[in-house]
C-alpha cells in the first residue's frame, strides 16, 4: 500500500497591524526573523520556511536589521526561505483592479533583489473572499496554483453531497476558473492554515495530535498528499520541529512525514490529482454558507479609510500615470522612483486588517498619515507633469488678443464632456517689487474687464465668471529661490465637450468678448432640468428623476435609512426585532443654493432624531465576548439629532445627478444607508469588481440565514430589466445591498459606527464609532439597457476622476493647441491604466472586457510607433501585434479578458 505523505510547511501569517499597533507587531517580527535565521543556521533538519507570500516582511525586518540582508539573501537563494509573490497580503475587494496588479508586480520586483527565487503560488490565506478574476491574474503572472482559506464551502467526500458546483467542492483541491476561462489549481485550507501548528515532541501528546489531525486532513484530500500548515497568526518559529517530525515518523510508520514547502507539495500533488476535480467559478465569497461570517461588512467599517484609498488610487491610476506617460513621450523622464514610493506607501494600507478598518484605533490613525503621504507624492507628480506638458503646447493662436489661455486635460481614458472651473491669474506682481500688503491694496483697485472664453478657431463659448479678487501664489524655480507674488484673478466656469481621452483642449479667456448665457437649470420649484434629465426634490428630500431619452421616471430615490448595529468592525448585526428608521415622509428643509446656466444645486437638510446608541446591554456583552450574532442588546430609547445636508447637483449636458452628503454623526452603534428603489424586475444585478462587472443574485442561497445580504462594489452597482437600468456610482463607498423587496432597491452604505474590533477577544475601538462630520459622494445614472450595453460604466468611471485644468502662457510649442496622444474605442471595453513599464521602458496600456463575449479594441496614435505587442499584467512581451502603418492596431478581446498593450516608441 502506498504511504500517505504529510507535507508540513512552516510559516507564520503576519498581519502587520491588527489588534496591536504596527510597531508592536514590528518588534515581534524582528524577534521572529532573528529566531528563524538562527534556526536555519543551527538546524539543517529545519528545511524551509514560507514567509507568508508577502515581500514587505523583508522590508520591515531590514529596516531595523540591515546587517542581516546578506544572510537573509543566502537562505532565500538556497530555497530555505520562500518569498513572494505579493508585496502585501491585500484585501482583494477593497483595493482596485490596478492595485491588485501592482501588488504582484512590486512583489516580484522586490523578490528579485534577493536572487529572484519567487514562490509561484497565488497565496490568499486569510482574504475575506476571493476575486473572480484571480485565476486570470495569476496565469498572467506565470502562476497556476492558488491557495486560499475562504470563499468555498468544503463538503468532504464522506460528509455531504455538493449541491452547487460553482461554490462547493468535496475536496480541498479543485479547479478555479475565472470569467475569461483561465484555470488554476485551487487549494483550500479546509482545516485552516494552522492545522499543523505546535507539533508535539512528547510521544503520548504526538499520538493524540496526529490521530486527530491526519483524519481531518484525509477527510478533504483528493490524494494521499496531506497538507499541514505549521504556523498561524504571528506564530513564533517552532524551533524543535525537526525533532517533532522524527517523533511522528517513529510513531506513524505508515505516513511519510516531510518538512515541505509549497513548491514540492504542489509538484507531488499534480502527479496524483484526480480527473474529476470540481470546478468552482468566479468570485468565491462564501455564497453557500449561513452568511454570518463572510466578513463583508468590513467594507463599511471606517468608511473614511475607503474613501481616502479610492481617492489615492484614482489619482495614481487615472491622473498621474497617464499624464506622466504622455509627458514621457514629450521628453520628460518618467518618475518610476516616485511612483514606486507612492504605490508602496499606499499599499502599506492595503492588508486586510488595515484597509478593512478592523483593527485597533492606533492602526487606523497611522493609515491616515500614509494615505496623505502617498497622495502628496502623487499630487507632486501631477503638478510636475502638467507643468512640463504646458510648456510644450503651442498657444500662439491666442497671441495679440489680450488672451489668458488655459488647458483642459482629460486623463480618464474616455472621451469626456462636462462642466469645468478654473481660476485664472490676469496679472502678477512679485514680492520683490514691493511689500505684499501694498501690492494687494493696489491690485484690488484694478477692475476686472468683462470677457468670455474662446476656442482656437475663434468661436466664443458660453461661460460664467466672477471676480476672484487678489490671491497669493508662488513659483518654485528649478534654479533659484522661491518667488512669491500676488495676482489679480477671475474664476471661470464653462461646459467643455469632446475632450479626447489622453489629450487636451486649450481655450482662452479674452476680455471684451461676450456671449449671451444659456437658460437656468432650475426650471420649477425645487426642480433641476437639462436636456437629458429632470430631477424634482420632494418634501422629504428624496428625488424623483426622469430620464428624458426613455421617458422613465424613478421616484423615492435617496431616502436615508438608519439601523442599529450591535455587531463589530467585521460584521453588521441589527438588534433582534428592530426595524430600520427612514427619512421617507420626514419633512426636510430645501433651498436652491446655486442657479446658473452651467450648474444648479438644491440643498436639503434633515434634522433626524435617532437613538443615541445601543443600550447598556451591548457593552456588557462585548466585555463578556458574547458572539455578535446571539447578542440580546437593543437600541437606546434616548434620541439625538442626526443632521444630514444633501446637495443635489445637475450640470448642463450631464447624464447623471451628483449627490454630496454631509453627516454630523452624534450617534453610536448604527448604520446609515441611501436607498434607490430601481423598480425593475430582475433576479440578478451587476456590480463592478476586480476587472469585471460581476453578476450576482439578488436573493442569496437557501443556506443563508443572515437577514442582510451585503456585498462589495467598486465604482458602481446597477439593476436592469434588460430594457432600462439604474446605476448608482460612488466614490469610496464599497458596501451595498440589493434589498429583497419588490422594488430591487439598491442600498448603499454611507456610514457605520461600531465600538469594538471583534473576532477573538475584547478590543474596544471608540474611534470606529465615527463620531463627527463625515461626507459621502455618489451619482445617480438612469439609462437604457444594462450598465455595460449602455456604456453607463464609462460615466461611472469618469465620475471618479477630477478634471485637470491649468493656465498656460501664450507661446510657441511642440504640440498643437488641441491634441490626443492616444485614441481608442471598444464597445463594452473599460480602460484600466496607461503607464511606462519599469523593465522595458515601453508604454503599456491596459483594458478589460466587461462583456462575456468577444469585443474589439482599436487603438491609434498620432505618430508611428516602432511596434505593438501583447503583454501580460507583469508587462512582459508576449507576442508582437501586426500594424500596417505602425499607428493603428486592432485586437479581439476574448470574454472578460484583461488585455495589456505594449507600445514601443
What are these language model-derived features?
Residues 1-98, 102-103, 110-114, 140, ...:
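N-terminal catalytic cores of secreted or lumenal carbohydrate-active enzymes
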Residues 7-10, 48-53, 77-93, 114-126, ...:
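Core alpha/beta catalytic barrel or barrel-like domain that forms the active/cofactor pocket
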Residues 8-9, 13-19, 24, 179-394, ...:
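Catalytic grooves of carbohydrate-active enzymes
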Residues 15-28, 52-61, 85-100, 117-128, ...:
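The substrate-binding groove and active-site-proximal loops of carbohydrate-active enzymes
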Residues 53-58, 89-92, 120-129, 152, ...:
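Conserved short loop/turn motifs at secondary-structure junctions
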Residues 101-140, 212-227:
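CE4/NodB-like, metal-dependent polysaccharide N-deacetylase domain
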Residues 134-139, 145-151, 172, 188, ...:
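C-terminal (or distal) subdomains of carbohydrate-active enzymes
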Amino acid at each position: 500500500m502506498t504511504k500517505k505523505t504529510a507535507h508540513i510547511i512552516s510559516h507564520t501569517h503576519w498581519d502587520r497591524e491588527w489588534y496591536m499597533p504596527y510597531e508592536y507587531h514590528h518588534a515581534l517580527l524582528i524577534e521572529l526573523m532573528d529566531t528563524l535565521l538562527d534556526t536555519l543556521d543551527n538546524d539543517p533538519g529545519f528545511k524551509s520556511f514560507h514567509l507568508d507570500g508577502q515581500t514587505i516582511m523583508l522590508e520591515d525586518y531590514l529596516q531595523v536589521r540591515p546587517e542581516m540582508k546578506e544572510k537573509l539573501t543566502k537562505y532565500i537563494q538556497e530555497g530555505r526561505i520562500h518569498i513572494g509573490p505579493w508585496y502585501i497580503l491585500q484585501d482583494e475587494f477593497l483595493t482596485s483592479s490596478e492595485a491588485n496588479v501592482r501588488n504582484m508586480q512590486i512583489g516580484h520586483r522586490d523578490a528579485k533583489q534577493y536572487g529572484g527565487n519567487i514562490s509561484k503560488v497565488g497565496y490568499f490565506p486569510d482574504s475575506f473572499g476571493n476575486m473572480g478574476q484571480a485565476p486570470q491574474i495569476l496565469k498572467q503572472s506565470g502562476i497556476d496554483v492558488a491557495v486560499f482559506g475562504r470563499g468555498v464551502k468544503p463538503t468532504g467526500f464522506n460528509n455531504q453531497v455538493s449541491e452547487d458546483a460553482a461554490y462547493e467542492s468535496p475536496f480541498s483541491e479543485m479547479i478555479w476558473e475565472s470569467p475569461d476561462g483561465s484555470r488554476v489549481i485551487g487549494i483550500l485550507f479546509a482545516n485552516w492554515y494552522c492545522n499543523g501548528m505546535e507539533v508535539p515532541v512528547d510521544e503520548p501528546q504526538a499520538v493524540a495530535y496526529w490521530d486527530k489531525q491526519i483524519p481531518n486532513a484525509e477527510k478533504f484530500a483528493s490524494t494521499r498528499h496531506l497538507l499541514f500548515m505549521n504556523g498561524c497568526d504571528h506564530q513564533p518559529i517552532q524551533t524543535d520541529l525537526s525533532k517533532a517530525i522524527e517523533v511522528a515518523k517513529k510513531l506513524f510508520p505508515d505516513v511519510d512525514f516531510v518538512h515541505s514547502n509549497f513548491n514540492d507539495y504542489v509538484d507531488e500533488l499534480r502527479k496524483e490529482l484526480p480527473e474529476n476535480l470540481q470546478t468552482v467559478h468566479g468570485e468565491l465569497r462564501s455564497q453557500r454558507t449561513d452568511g454570518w461570517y463572510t466578513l463583508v461588512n468590513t467594507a463599511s467599517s471606517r468608511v473614511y479609510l475607503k474613501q481616502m484609498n479610492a481617492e489615492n488610487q484614482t489619482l495614481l491610476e487615472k491622473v498621474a500615470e497617464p499624464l506622466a506617460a504622455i509627458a514621457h513621450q514629450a521628453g520628460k523622464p518618467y518618475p518610476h522612483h516616485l511612483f514606486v514610493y507612492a504605490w508602496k506607501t499606499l499599499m502599506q494600507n492595503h492588508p486586510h486588517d488595515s484597509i478593512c478598518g478592523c483593527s485597533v484605533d492606533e492602526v487606523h490613525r497611522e493609515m491616515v498619515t500614509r494615505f496623505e503621504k502617498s497622495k502628496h507624492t502623487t499630487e507632486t507628480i501631477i503638478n510636475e507633469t502638467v507643468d512640463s506638458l504646458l510648456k510644450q503646447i503651442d498657444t500662439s493662436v491666442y497671441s495679440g488678443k489680450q488672451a489668458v489661455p488655459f488647458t483642459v486635460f482629460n486623463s480618464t481614458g474616455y472621451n469626456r464632456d462636462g462642466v469645468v472651473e478654473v481660476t485664472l491669474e490676469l496679472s502678477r506682481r512679485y514680492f520683490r517689487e514691493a511689500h505684499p500688503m501694498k501690492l494687494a491694496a493696489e491690485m484690488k483697485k484694478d477692475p476686472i474687464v468683462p470677457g468670455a472664453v474662446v476656442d482656437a478657431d475663434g468661436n466664443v463659448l458660453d461661460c460664467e465668471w466672477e471676480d476672484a479678487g487678489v490671491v497669493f501664489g508662488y513659483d518654485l524655480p528649478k534654479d533659484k529661490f522661491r518667488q512669491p507674488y500676488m495676482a489679480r484673478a477671475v474664476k471661470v466656469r464653462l461646459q467643455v465637450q469632446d475632450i479626447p481621452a489622453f489629450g487636451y483642449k486649450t481655450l482662452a479667456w479674452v476680455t471684451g468678448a461676450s456671449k449671451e448665457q444659456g437658460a437656468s437649470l432650475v426650471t420649477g420649484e425645487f426642480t433641476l432640468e437639462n436636456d437629458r434629465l429632470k430631477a424634482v426634490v420632494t418634501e422629504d428630500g428624496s428625488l424623483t428623476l426622469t430620464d428624458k431619452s426613455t421617458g422613465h421616471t424613478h421616484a423615492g430615490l435617496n431616502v436615508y435609512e438608519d439601523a442599529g448595529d450591535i455587531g463589530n468592525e467585521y460584521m453588521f448585526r441589527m438588534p433582534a426585532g428592530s426595524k430600520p428608521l427612514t427619512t421617507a415622509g420626514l419633512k426636510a428643509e430645501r433651498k436652491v443654493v446655486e442657479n446658473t446656466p452651467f450648474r444648479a444645486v438644491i440643498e436639503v437638510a434633515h434634522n433626524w432624531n435617532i437613538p443615541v446608541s445601543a443600550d447598556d446591554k451591548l457593552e456588557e456583552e462585548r466585555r463578556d465576548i458574547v458572539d455578535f450574532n446571539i447578542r440580546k442588546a437593543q437600541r437606546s430609547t434616548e434620541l439625538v439629532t442626526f443632521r444630514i445636508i444633501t446637495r443635489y447637483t445637475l450640470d448642463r449636458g450631464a447624464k447623471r445627478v451628483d449627490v454630496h452628503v454631509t453627516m454630523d454623526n452624534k450617534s453610536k452603534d448604527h448604520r446609515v444607508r441611501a436607498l434607490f428603489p430601481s423598480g425593475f424586475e430582475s433576479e440578478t444585478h451587476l456590480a463592478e469588481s476586480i476587472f469585471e462587472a460581476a453578476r450576482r443574485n439578488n436573493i442569496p442561497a437557501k443556506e443563508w440565514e443572515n437577514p442582510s445580504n451585503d456585498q462589495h462594489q467598486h465604482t458602481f452597482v446597477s439593476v436592469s430589466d434588460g430594457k432600462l437600468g439604474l446605476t448608482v456610482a460612488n466614490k469610496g463607498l464599497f458596501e451595498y445591498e440589493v434589498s429583497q423587496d419588490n422594488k430591487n432597491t439598491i442600498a448603499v452604505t454611507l456610514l457605520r459606527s461600531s465600538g469594538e474590533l471583534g473576532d477573538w477577544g475584547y478590543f474596544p475601538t471608540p474611534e470606529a464609532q465615527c463620531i463627527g462630520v463625515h461626507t459621502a459622494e455618489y451619482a445617480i445614472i438612469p439609462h437604457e439597457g444594462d450598465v455595460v450595453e449602455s456604456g453607463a460604466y464609462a460615466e461611472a468611471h469618469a465620475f471618479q476622476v477630477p478634471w485637470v485644468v491649468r493656465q498656460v502662457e501664450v507661446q510657441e510649442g511642440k504640440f498643437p493647441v488641441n491634441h490626443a496622444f492616444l485614441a481608442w474605442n471598444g464597445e463594452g471595453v473599460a480602460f484600466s491604466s496607461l503607464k511606462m513599464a519599469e523593465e522595458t521602458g515601453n508604454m503599456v496600456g491596459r483594458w478589460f472586457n466587461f462583456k462575456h463575449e468577444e469585443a474589439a479594441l482599436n487603438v491609434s496614435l498620432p505618430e508611428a510607433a516602432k511596434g505593438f505587442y501583447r503583454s501580460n499584467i507583469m508587462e512582459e512581451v508576449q507576442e508582437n501585434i501586426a500594424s500596417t502603418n505602425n499607428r493603428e492596431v486592432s485586437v479581439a478581446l476574448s470574454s472578460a479578458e484583461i488585455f495589456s498593450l505594449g507600445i514601443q516608441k
